[in-house]
Amino acid sequence: MALPPSGETQSQDKANYLPQSNPHHLTTYYAHAPGYSHFRNLATTEEEFQPWKLAAAVLESQAMAPLDAFRMTAPLLNPGLAVQSEPLYNLPWYKLSPWNRIPQFTPEVPRFLDSTEHRSSGSSNQNLVLGGGGGQISGQRWEAENLLLPSPVIASLLPDGIKSSQSISVPQTLNQEGKLPFCGFNFTEEELSFVLYGAIASPEHPTDLQHAISGILVPTESSGSNHLHKTLDKDSLQLPEGLCLMQTSFGDVPHFGVFCSDFIAKGVRFGPFRGRVVNASEVKAHRDNSRMWEIFEDGHLSHFIDGKGSGNWMSYVNCARFPKEQNLLAVQHQGQIFYESCRDIQRNQELLVWYGNGYEKFLGVPMNLRVTEQGGQQLSESSEESAEGYRCERCGKVFTYKYYRDKHLKYTPCVDKGDRKFPCSLCQRSFEKRDRLRIHILHVHERHRPYLCSTCGKSFSQSSSLNKHMRVHSGDRPYQCVYCTKKFTASSILRTHIRQHSGEKPFKCKHCGKAFASHAAHDSHVRRSHKDNGRSSCDICGKGFLDQEAFYAHMRLHKTC
């Protein structure tokens, strides 16, 4: 939402113009609109995918729907948009807290050429009915707090007038229900396709053209397939079996897309999306975010993955324009982006990705913000839990990550009140299942380690632990970092390594405040620097030890369980 900085007032004498009804004027009009990255502090309560929406009401100093208005869902991940923009605020959007108060505004009816001024003084909670001509979607409801608004457009860059065939109905007043009447726009399907899949001028190289969606440079001398194929090495993309990179076109503009050469069943997952890790502080230096994904942890922005120049085939998968066209879901799992087929994909169909109904569940992104009548924000229950950490209901201990809270609940007696079916006769623990009791006795009390390494003689309580250990001798490292060439024997080691790229340091010393990327580094620091401050304590269950060897044995016990 392009709001003025604090203390500034908007001009009251700017008129809004609609572009002439042809693709070239539409491209000129939309090319100056800001990208999605400047609207991230705008709350949204929309749950369903509805990309074909045109904004029917904007601030009086702003023009009508930019290219971004056709992709109205979550303004968080957008791997297919190449429209570049300039900063609208002195403070970058990524430094704004997602819980910041959202500036309130009064939606107004736009003023058009040769038309009188029309204003509405309703509250920001008014419902707007939107629609469009040609391939219009009618009957869709749009809340004012969901509205994405473009920045002011320079009048000299717009067409001189409006064709007589473009009849625009500007409502005079609100109806009895306090809502704006229907407002129509005559955009043809061909014009919309040109805007979404046509060519726009590259801001970095004005003589070159870029695809509006993929961001791939379009050859200016020839639009033939032979010339276009020379700009990309398909063999370097390492496409999975059953997929191929093909050229398609909308009108005369060539365009790359990923197609399936064989049938793909529902539920097949591709990935991960490979690229360079970019910290939030570096984003302002990246003018083109067309292939950049945002990674969230516990509902907060962690880092970005930039697929530009990585030779990643997933960066050539285009965005779906409407629900029936979508066949891939973008999901986040363990800090990585995957594409998962949400329906059966027939042979020769193009892969088209967008977000699904499980967007919040997959990404952990706080999407359930609600704007209160006083203008403040009300958090959902899950957002409140993420904001203050994850608390154990039995003992009150707070954990930074849900993973460690769950570990705490699983392995500590604080959650056990002796009311479970299978109590342990050797201690005060009890279990809901008999097999968990058996494993507890073997591992904790009998120190039973039947799985012996034939190479070094080390023993383990579980076969899975032995299998992990054998990788040390065989040299097998199946877990590879997506950001560099390093490989690891265990997924836990890989997770710790990735924090070197992201800069995340979740383990903070309670004595001096110094942060660390791993438990081991944190514990080593405490033992070396704060030995006199007390005895060593387990971060998982809270048990304390004066003897370091006993502490090490206890920590190994958690790893084997």
Swiss-Prot record:
It is an enzyme of class 2 (transferase). GO terms for cellular component: nucleoplasm; nucleus. S-adenosyl-L-methionine binds at residue 355. A zinc finger (C2H2-type) spans 390-416, 422-445, 451-473, 479-501, 507-530, 536-558. It is found in: Nucleus. Belongs to the class V-like SAM-binding methyltransferase superfamily. Transcription factor that has both positive and negative roles on transcription. Plays a role in cellular pluripotency. Essential for germ cell development at 2 levels: the reacquisition of potential pluripotency, including SOX2 up-regulation, and successful epigenetic reprogramming, characterized by EHMT1 repression. Its association with CBFA2T2 is required for the functions in pluripotency and germ cell formation. This is PR domain zinc finger protein 14. It comes from Mus musculus.
